[in-house]
Regions:
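Glycine-rich phosphate-binding loops that contact phosphosugars or nucleotide phosphates
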Residues: 37, 44-207
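Acidic, Ser/Thr-rich low-complexity intrinsically disordered segments
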Residues: 229-253
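Generic N-terminal amphipathic, Lys/Arg-enriched alpha-helix
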Residues: 1-20
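A short, well-structured juxtamembrane/interface segment
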Residues: 20-37, 103
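Conserved acidic
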Residues: 2, 24, 194, 198
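Flexible, glycine/charged-enriched surface loops at secondary-structure junctions
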Residues: 20-28, 42, 214-224
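Internal, active-site/partner-interface "lid" segment
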Residues: 179-183, 212-237
Length: 253
């Protein structure tokens, strides 16, 4: 049964992340905790399915104020498949050098901020544009993706750089370059990608560690509560408080 094959591959990725990435998780968390303790931002960016970890972390039950999602609709909303905002346009834009620079012009950054970028391959120019602009503004850069699998691939950006080479900290998702992990008889291509579950695991490993570091420093966290629990009469108040805090902090971005 191929369901078990996929689960075995997913478990293998989780085990590799645990075995090899805890030190990187800790270093990334320390950088992010510095930003959030200063009431600054961890800006999060990705394109394609690498926007899923951005959307997973905030706003979300169990997430907390301090993470600022930079979601570009043409880079994430391509589920029409064809027609307007289709896959052809998306594939063009993620490889269009210069587009990421234009994205960055729409925000105000501070050197106390952190940039966190997600990319499976680290090759597409839009991510490298964003990374280069973040570094030029003095932001530390954390990158999460399949760094080891793409170490020997040539760069696509005119700078000659790949995303993982620009990072101050890389959290490797430990996913093979061929993301889809389950082969099928009589087919060239596999099914069953594992990068999304690896991204999600990396996100919560880092964020729970950020929370741990902030609590150790005495920083109050504005956490989004589980707001559908029977008997919890203050969840909506706590949610409203978190949203007010987000609104206050994001005003200058």
């Amino acid at each position: 049964m191929l369901a078990k094959t996929w689960l075995e591959h997913a478990r293998g990725v989780m085990e590799r992340i645990e075995a090899t990435q805890l030190e990187a998780v800790g270093r990334a968390a320390e950088i992010m905790a510095d930003s959030i303790a200063a009431e600054r931002w961890v800006h999060t960016f990705g394109c394609g399915h690498a926007t899923i970890p951005v959307e997973e972390m905030y706003p979300r039950i169990g997430g907390f104020v301090g993470f600022h999602p930079m979601i570009e609709l043409p880079l994430t909303y391509f589920t029409h498949i064809t027609g307007e905002m289709g896959i052809h346009q998306f594939l063009f834009l993620e490889r269009a050098e210069g587009f990421g620079r234009e994205v960055m012009k729409s925000y105000e950054f501070d050197p106390r901020d952190t940039m966190w970028i997600f990319s499976h391959s680290g090759l597409n120019p839009v991510n490298i544009d964003v990374a280069l602009e973040a570094k030029a503004r003095g932001l530390p850069l954390v990158v999460t993706g399949s760094a080891a699998a793409y170490r020997d691939e040539p760069a696509r950006h005119s700078s000659g750089m790949k995303l993982f080479e620009l990072a101050d900290v890389v959290v490797d998702t430990c996913v093979p370059a061929v993301d889809a992990s389950v082969p099928l008889a009589d087919h060239v291509d596999n099914v069953g990608p594992v990068s999304t579950i690896a991204f999600t695991a990396a996100v919560w490993m880092v964020i729970t560690t950020v929370a741990e570091r902030l609590v150790e420093r005495g920083v109050r966290l504005f956490i989004h509560p589980s707001h559908n629990l029977p008997g919890d009469t203050t969840a909506r108040e706590r949610l409203d408080a978190a949203l007010r805090e987000y609104k206050r902090r994001v005003a200058g971005v």
